A protein has these predicted regions:
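An aromatic- and histidine-rich active-site surface loop
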Residues: 70, 83-107, 117-124
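Conserved nucleotide-sugar phosphate-binding/catalytic loop shared by glycosyltransferases and other
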Residues: 30-69, 73-80
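Conserved donor-binding/catalytic core segment of Leloir-type glycosyltransferases
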Residues: 5-6, 173-191, 197-201, 211-217
């Protein structure tokens, strides 16, 4: 029986920022007999395939208690299951916690990270540590992983593109009529939505058309 272990921050189909992870897990479900997910937070998961099993950490626990529970949960799962590999999505801390367990069980670790990098000093240290501990790093582009220079083995970094179902978003447009406009995005400072709104208002369409912003914060 082929199984895979996934570590992520959130499993919630209704979350505007991380809800896409559901499609990733369902894609794994087609390739593996069982997909075991360890998530820091769990929301709506009714869209998951039946062979995707999600375990989450109690959000009411303190930070140290969460780390201990996470370690014990990963240790328990890896002891009772044989995994093809373990994928950690955007969580440096989870790959650091899991690393000694995965090494002991001889399970390959893969770390997905696509971001300019954290501003917080401690999170920078976590990211550098995770980059060293993991067996492989996958990212969207050659510029989407910030700490290439710290890698002990440059060949562990693999550029695979964004994991997006392009066909679901592509629609051929033969002509364009001036209608209302929409921005679909996570609501955060890094997305510079204020600049987009300002640009729209100052454009020739700004006085005669409506702009809607659809999205939500990361947390």
């Amino acid at each position: 029986m082929k199984k895979v272990l996934v570590l992520n921050i959130l499993t919630d189909s209704k979350n505007t920022s991380l809800g896409f992870a559901i499609s990733w897990l369902n894609a794994f479900a087609k390739k593996f007999d069982e997909v075991h997910v360890v998530s820091l937070n769990k929301g709506s998961d009714n869209e998951l395939e039946k062979n995707v099993i999600v375990s989450s950490i109690d959000n009411e626990l303190g930070k140290i208690s969460k780390v201990i529970k996470l370690f014990r949960l990963i240790s328990k799962l890896t002891k009772s299951n044989k995994y093809e590999f373990c994928l950690s999505h955007m969580s440096s801390l989870m790959i650091i916690i899991a690393s000694p367990i995965l090494k002991k069980r001889k399970i390959e670790s893969i770390f997905w990270y696509t971001h300019k990098g954290p501003n917080n000093f401690l999170k920078k240290i976590f990211l550098m540590k995770a980059s060293i501990y993991t067996n492989k790093i996958i990212t969207a582009s050659k510029n989407s992983f910030p700490y290439k220079r710290f890698l002990n083995n440059k060949s562990k970094l693999h550029v695979i593109g964004h994991a997006i179902k392009f066909d679901e978003f592509f629609r051929k447009v033969n002509s364009f009529e001036g209608k209302d406009f929409v921005i679909i995005s996570r609501i955060s400072k890094s997305k510079k939505i204020d600049e987009s709104v300002s640009g729209f208002l100052n454009s020739e369409k700004g006085s005669s058309h409506k702009l809607s912003v659809i999205g939500g914060p990361l947390s």
